[in-house]
């Protein structure tokens, strides 16, 4: 959803990074949680909860998201799971990197798995 009065985007789980956090992260803005590796936790959440992101070119979707955010004049992002984002210039590149990060090689459709020795597959 989008609140036109506050220019606030509510992306649901689109910017989520699971329930992992350290003491003190709750109640902070994303930019204040300097010990939280946003790229990594976003990548893990996307891989595990939004599995389809591991089998498609996420650049297409992230490009469209960024264009939409610019068209709407988004100033704040309030994800369902995750910290509010108020400094888009600082945080959105980390979000982009997390959403397009390569997933766990065992879970993606990249290279086929190597058969176990003695098993021709």
Residue ranges and their predicted role:
Residues 64, 86-121:
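C-terminal regulatory/interaction regions
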Residues 2-79, 84-87:
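Metallo-beta-lactamase
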